[in-house]
Swiss-Prot record:
SMART domains: CLECT. Disulfide bonds join C80-C91. This is C-type lectin domain family 2 member D. Residues 87-202 form the C-type lectin domain. Homodimer; disulfide-linked. The gene is Clec2d. Receptor for KLRB1B that protects target cells against natural killer cell-mediated lysis. Inhibits osteoclast formation. Binds high molecular weight sulfated glycosaminoglycans. Residues 63-207 are extracellular. It comes from the Eukaryota. The modification Phosphoserine is found at S7, S12. It is found in: Cell membrane. The lineage of its organism: Eukaryota, Metazoa, Chordata, Craniata, Vertebrata.
Length: 207
């Protein structure tokens, strides 16, 4: 005999088909008529219930672990500092008052940045649009009118946009890029990469 307790309650005949079947088996047991087939069915039902219970618990644990281990992948770069504007992988700062080129570069360096550099036409378009009508220093300079233009990290400018004038320090105006003397007063723009990685920056100060 597969069940030894005779005090198991009779299940309602209005229950599910599985409950009715188990009830019949138990009822038959009270009358001493449980067949080997009924006994096997009873064990089968209990086995199915146990398997489903274990599966639900395992699934809950797995989902909980997955949520805990998830790492956001949509934040490739760190946020820009307050009052800076993010564009692609860079942060830009637009000054609120004018200064000469030397002070502007020193200010940017204090923010772990450089006077602004643009690497493509889209970045230049953004700078031109956002500076409004203010002439603004950028990071282009040269030793003399006979030397090539360079950025503050000493990489050469590719001359995609011509620079007007014969002076040594460049700034943006409504006509594009022009040059003037170092002590002229202009607004300025700083730029830096906005990733978590540390990037070495060599300060440039004209002699």
């Amino acid at each position: 005999m597969c069940v030894t307790k005779a005090s198991l309650p009779m299940l309602s005949p209005t229950g599910s088909p599985q409950e009715v079947e188990v009830g019949k088996i138990l009822q038959g047991k009270r009358h001493g008529t449980i067949s080997p087939e009924s006994c096997a069915k009873l064990y089968c039902y209990y086995g199915v219930i146990m398997v489903l219970t274990v599966a639900v618990i395992a699934l809950s644990v797995a989902l909980s672990a997955t949520k805990t281990e998830q790492i956001p992948v949509n934040k490739t770069y760190a946020a820009c500092p307050q009052n800076w504007i993010g564009v692609e992988n860079k942060c830009f700062y637009f000054s609120e008052y004018p200064s000469n080129w030397t002070f502007a570069q020193a200010f940017c360096m204090a923010q772990e940045a450089q006077l602004a550099r643009f690497d493509n036409q889209d970045e230049l378009n953004f700078l031109m649009r956002y500076k409004a009508n203010f002439d603004s220093w950028i990071g282009l300079h040269r030793e003399s009118s006979e030397h090539p233009w360079k950025w503050t990290d000493n990489t050469e400018y590719n001359n995609t946009i011509p620079i007007r004038g014969e002076e040594r320090f460049a700034y943006l105006n409504n006509n594009g890029i022009s040059s003037t003397r170092i002590y002229s007063l202009r607004m300025w723009i700083c730029s830096k990469l906005n990733s978590y990685s540390l990037h070495c920056q060599t300060p440039f100060f004209p002699s």
